[in-house]
Swiss-Prot record:
UniProt subunit comment: A double ring-shaped homohexamer of HslV is capped on each side by a ring-shaped HslU homohexamer. The assembly of the HslU/HslV complex is dependent on binding of ATP.
Name listed for the protein in its UniProt record: ATP-dependent protease ATPase subunit HslU
Family matches, as PANTHER family: ATP-DEPENDENT CLP PROTEASE ATP-BINDING SUBUNIT CLPX-LIKE, MITOCHONDRIAL-RELATED, ATP-DEPENDENT PROTEASE ATPASE SUBUNIT HSLU
Main location (coarse class): cytoplasm
Domain of life: Bacteria
InterPro entries, alphabetized: AAA+_ATPase, ATP-dep_Clp_protease_ClpX, ATPase_AAA_core, Clp_ATPase_C, HslU, P-loop_NTPase
A single GO cellular-component term on record: HslUV protease complex
Length: 441
């Protein structure tokens, strides 16, 4: 069962502060994938296209973080790419079709993991038998069903399952690792070189060799080997392609960097506009050739994001604007947002630093006045210099706790309490001097 929009938003709330509109848009889009698959009429189901999303907002407000967290929530093929990495066909760089190829690779890996999980108990039993054959070699080369249940074998089996034999060394025959052949791909020819690499790897994939290792390590290797024998690679390919076509999600970051500004004319803009034109068929729906077969992009959900500081969404070519119908604006962060970022997420910065210092035996605590002062400092520096959003908190926290981090080993058993006075003492001079703040914070 896929999560409801409310559950998705609640899960995102654990990691991202504010930006409710963006969370709701993403949650609805994710749920609509499931709703579409539940429609019984195949003709109608095929006609329902995903509504692609464009997230607009300054840097450091949570656009990329929403994508990261969404990847964990979406039990579907998901890939995040930077728009700046791609160039128009004919220019040096990657072409946009490689997005779908990478997404398919991701789906193959995902489906293989699912398939291996289903057969893990059978693989475990087969690996166990192979190890017991080494520990108790059969007299005539093969074991009869009766011999598999002898008392000695059962004793060893019990010890093996309880981990008593984990450190024992054994010699076992395992598949030889294919020789890794690294081929440097010329721009735009990654697909051909990856096929060459896989061809060379398959040449030596059926060889075996005897290796000496601990029982624990042998168990892990043999479990993977046995699981690989039990799964059907053709089924995995078919399921992966279907999963990409019906449930795939592509997150395109930094879209504003390939927008052509209306008031500038430069040679680089030709390639930028070319990337937008190349993205059009992909976003609207086309068929891309991959090493696993043809993949249709008609029902893949595209989520794009950009700061749009210099360029505006209207600077994108009209056809691409039309293919991103849902627009969501993310707001700049306030002092209150910074306070919440430092305290509310399940892995907040204050918790992270406290946990790091705890490994040295030093107790690091933060009170409300200290947290609010850190938030105020970060907000002030953002206002006076470049606004880099929540990323400013990393810089401020590193600077604030630099001495503590350096001397933590010598202060084991002590407690460092971060309050307003502590923040002012360690950052006061930097805050007062704007030039220093510009370069250090």
């Amino acid at each position: 069962m896929v999560m409801t929009p409310r559950e998705i938003v609640q899960e995102l709330d654990k990691h991202i502060i504010g930006q409710d509109d963006a969370k709701r848009a993403v949650a609805i889009a994710l749920r609509n994938r499931w709703r579409r698959m539940k429609i019984k009429d195949p003709v109608l189901r095929n006609e329902i296209m995903p509504k692609n999303i464009l997230m607009i907002g300054p840097t450091g407000v949570g656009k990329t973080e929403i994508a990261r967290r969404l990847a964990n929530l979406a039990k579907a093929p998901f890939i995040k790419v930077e728009a700046t990495k791609f160039t128009e066909v004919g220019y040096v760089g990657r072409d946009v079709d490689s997005i779908i190829r990478d997404l398919t690779d991701m789906a193959i890996k995902q489906e293989r993991e699912f398939a291996m999980k289903k057969v893990e108990h059978l693989a475990e039993d087969a690996a166990e038998e192979r190890i017991l054959d080494v520990l108790l070699p059969p007299a005539r080369g093969t074991l009869t069903p009766g011999e598999k249940n002898t008392t000695a074998r059962q004793v060893f089996r019990k010890q093996l399952r309880e981990g008593e034999l984990n450190d024992n060394e054994i010699e076992i025959e395992v598949a030889a690792t294919p020789v890794g052949i690294e081929i440097m791909a010329p721009p735009g020819m990654e697909e051909m070189t990856s096929q060459l690499q896989s061809m060379f790897q398959q040449v030596g994939s059926y060889r075996t060799k005897t290796r000496k290792m601990t029982v624990a390590k042998a168990m892990k290797i043999l479990r993977e080997e046995e699981a690989a024998k039990l799964i059907n690679e053709e089924d995995i390919k078919l399921k992966a392609i279907e999963s990409v076509e019906q449930n795939g999600i592509v997150f395109i970051d930094e879209l504003d960097k390939i927008a052509k500004r209306s008031d500038t004319v430069s040679g680089g803009d030709v390639s930028r506009e070319g990337v937008q034109r190349d993205l059009l068929p992909l976003v609207e729906g086309t068929t891309v050739s991959t090493k696993y077969g043809m993949v249709k992009s008609d029902h893949i959900l595209f989520i794009a994001s950009g700061a749009f500081h210099v360029a505006k969404p209207s600077d994108l070519i009209a056809e691409l604007q039309g293919r991103l119908p849902i627009r969501v604006e993310l707001s700049a962060l306030s002092v209150e947002d910074f306070v919440r970022i430092l305290t509310e997420p399940s892995a907040s910065l204050t918790l992270q630093y406290s946990a790091l210092m705890e490994t040295e035996g030093l107790t690091l605590t933060f009170d409300e006045t200290g947290i609010r002062r850190i938030a105020e400092v970060a907000w002030q520096v953002n206002e006076r210099t470049e606004n880099i959003g929540a990323r400013r908190l990393y810089t401020v926290m590193e600077r604030l706790l630099e001495v503590v981090s350096f001397e933590a080993t010598d202060k084991a058993g002590e407690t460092v309490h971060v309050d307003k006075a502590y923040v002012d003492k360690n950052l006061g001079q930097l805050i007062a001097d704007e030039d220093l703040a510009r370069y250090i914070l």
